[in-house]
């Protein structure tokens, strides 16, 4: 009898050890499956990022109407006006530009400068190239005024500046007055003159290059304009234009394709019942949200032609649309119904997708063939809000 009891005790101990080992193996197997699943999710996230960067590069060039990446051999110093313009658009979301494309063309050559008494004439050569699919809205000639304080002061500081378009007809030079003004403030500053009419003629005639004559009349010999070709105070033509192509419609089509692609990626993840419990436990940490996705132009080899910004946060939408859908993810009615169906029968409907619901614009300053351009890219460049759809 004692032997039978002892045997039963040994058998119960062995059974408990075996049972605990089996449970431990089952737990290890579940943990292993969970780790493997997490690795697949991380690999999928990496593929999404690479896919996004590829899409972003193509879309970026298309928005700028560039057939390829500009091959710039040297950095160009942007004119001060272009720097200020970019900073205003980049820092103030409510600052709406009058044109979506602004280009600067620095004076190519000073053909001559002649001083006769109290009058000085400067003949300037500009080479302005604007794509045919853009419409010129306005053009400024910006001149930096120089007051020579070391020279004797005049009783009456008076200076007038007139700007002319130079036209040649049968070897005859004809001057057409474009703009002019009197300058009385004795400080070094930028003065802007309207030369829209002349540059439009250059553009429509497809010759691109044109000459502008600047005449300075002063009451004393203490005033001039900066014509240095070595720094960013040189004379510069600023062209404001609108892109008349179907860029905006095409951009929205691309965004819709991106949304569909994200939906397909989520939809391809078949809802498996044994994953559903683990996902539910992690719902609070993996809920639909906007996360950072920084694009550094140096990292992708674009810093030679992108002047500013050096990087920007495009953001992305990550996570899953778990029940209940809260107001902060602004769910559509269809997403709410789809989530309820998925909750009751995961095989019947996938979960709603976490996608961008609002996109914001950015301003970009870049150089192409030595020309500095500021472009305001509308509504398609970075995620502002995410939601369940």
From Swiss-Prot:
Q: Where is the composition biased (Polar residues)?
A: 263-272
Gene Ontology cellular component list: extracellular space
- List the cysteine pairs that form cystine: 288-354, 317-386, 321-388
What effect does gene inactivation have here? Morpholino knockdown of the protein causes slight decreases in both anterior-posterior and dorsal-ventral axes, while trunk and tail anatomy are otherwise normal. Vascular patterning is relatively normal, although defects are detected in maturation of the caudal vein: the caudal venous plexus fails to resolve and both dorsal and ventral veins continue to carry blood flow.
Q: Which residues form the propeptide?
A: 21-280
Q: Which Pfam families match?
A: TGF_beta, TGFb_propeptide
Among CDD domains, the record links this protein to: TGF_beta_BMP9 (cd19400)
What Gene Ontology terms describe what this protein does at the molecular function level? cytokine activity; growth factor activity
Glycosylated positions are 65, 118, 127, 232, 342
Under the heading InterPro entries, the entry gives: Cystine-knot_cytokine (IPR029034), TGF-b_C (IPR001839), TGF-b_propeptide (IPR001111), TGF-beta-rel (IPR015615), TGFb_CS (IPR017948)
**UniProtKB keywords:** Angiogenesis, Cleavage on pair of basic residues, Cytokine, Disulfide bond, Glycoprotein, Growth factor, Secreted, Signal
Q: Where in the cell does this protein reside?
A: Secreted
The highest taxon in the source lineage is: Eukaryota
Q: Name one GO biological process term.
A: BMP signaling pathway
Q: What's this chain's function?
A: Potent circulating inhibitor of angiogenesis. Signals through the type I activin receptor ACVRL1 but not other Alks. Signaling through SMAD1 in endothelial cells requires TGF-beta coreceptor endoglin/eng.
**What quaternary structure, including any partners, is listed in this protein's UniProt entry?**
Homodimer; disulfide-linked.
| Protein family membership | Belongs to the TGF-beta family.
Spell out the protein name for this chain: Growth/differentiation factor 2
């Amino acid at each position: 009898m004692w032997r039978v009891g002892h045997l039963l005790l040994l058998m119960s101990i062995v059974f408990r050890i075996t049972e605990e080992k089996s449970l431990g193996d089952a737990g290890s197997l579940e943990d292993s499956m969970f780790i493997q699943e997490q690795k697949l999710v991380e690999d999928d996230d990496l593929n999404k990022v690479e896919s996004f960067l590829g899409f972003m590069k193509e879309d970026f060039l298309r928005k700028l109407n560039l057939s390829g990446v500009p091959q710039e051999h040297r950095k160009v110093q942007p004119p001060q006006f272009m720097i200020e313009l970019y900073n205003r658009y980049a820092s103030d979301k409510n600052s709406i530009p009058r044109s979506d494309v602004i280009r600067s063309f620095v004076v190519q050559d000073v053909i001559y400068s002649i001083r006769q008494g109290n009058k000085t004439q400067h003949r300037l050569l500009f080479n302005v190239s604007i794509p045919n699919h853009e419409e010129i809205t306005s053009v400024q000639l910006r001149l930096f005024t120089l007051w020579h304080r070391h020279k004797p002061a005049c009783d009456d500081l008076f200076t007038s500046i007139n700007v002319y378009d130079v036209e040649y007809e049968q070897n005859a030079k004809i001057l057409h007055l474009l703009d002019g003004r009197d300058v009385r403030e004795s400080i070094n500053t930028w003065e802007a003159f309207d030369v829209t009419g002349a540059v439009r003629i250059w553009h429509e005639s497809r010759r691109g290059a044109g000459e502008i004559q600047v005449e300075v009349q002063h009451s004393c010999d203490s005033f001039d304009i900066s014509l240095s070709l070595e720094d960013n105070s040189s004379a510069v033509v600023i062209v404001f234009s609108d892109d008349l192509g179907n860029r905006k419609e095409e951009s929205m089509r691309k965004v819709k394709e991106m949304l569909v692609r994200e939906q397909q990626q989520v939809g391809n993840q078949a809802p498996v019942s044994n994953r559903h419990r683990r996902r539910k436990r992690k719902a609070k940490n993996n809920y639909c949200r906007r996360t950072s996705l920084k694009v550094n132009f140096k990292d992708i080899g674009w810093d030679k032609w992108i002047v500013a910004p050096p990087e920007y946060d495009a953001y992305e939408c990550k996570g899953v649309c778990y029940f209940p859908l809260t107001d902060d993810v602004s769910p559509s009615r269809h997403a709410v119904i789809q989530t309820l169906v998925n909750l009751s029968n995961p095989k019947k409907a996938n979960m709603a997708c976490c996608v961008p619901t609002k996109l914001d614009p950015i301003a970009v300053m870049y150089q192409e063939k030595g020309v500095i351009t500021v472009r305001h890219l509308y509504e398609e460049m970075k995620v502002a809000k995410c939601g369940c759809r």
